């Protein structure tokens, strides 16, 4: 009888330990939170994608190409570059229905904006879509074009003059400047 109570106690203690560890994983992002998130993201993002040598998202079957608008004074053009904050690493993925009149410009083409943005390397959300959306909602612009060229985990040296990411970014800006003025 006493052996039975000890075994029951250990089973209950183990269940409680697992339960509280599970709470810690969810609340405090303990291991294996990152592993679980990566597996979850594999199933959430169901599209055909292509990346370039910098790891930037250059094609996604989820992105719908549209005609690029002509530049005018009610068209905003925002450029985002740098590390993770501009590289599709934020938690919230914006969908087209959340971003009215927000356009993702990449490689001379325009797409209905949605997360992750073409031109950056992550597979999640970013801040630039929300900023563009607020500019449209407040009536500052009728439409906003966003250009994202962020690469997460890069050093400042890589973005410095003469280095690989600097050359890539200059090419992005040169391409953009043929059609638009950055506002």
Enumerate the language-model features and the residues they cover.
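Conserved SGNH/GDSL esterase-like catalytic core that processes O-acyl groups on lipids
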Residues: 111-182
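N-terminal secretory targeting modules
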Residues: 1-127, 138
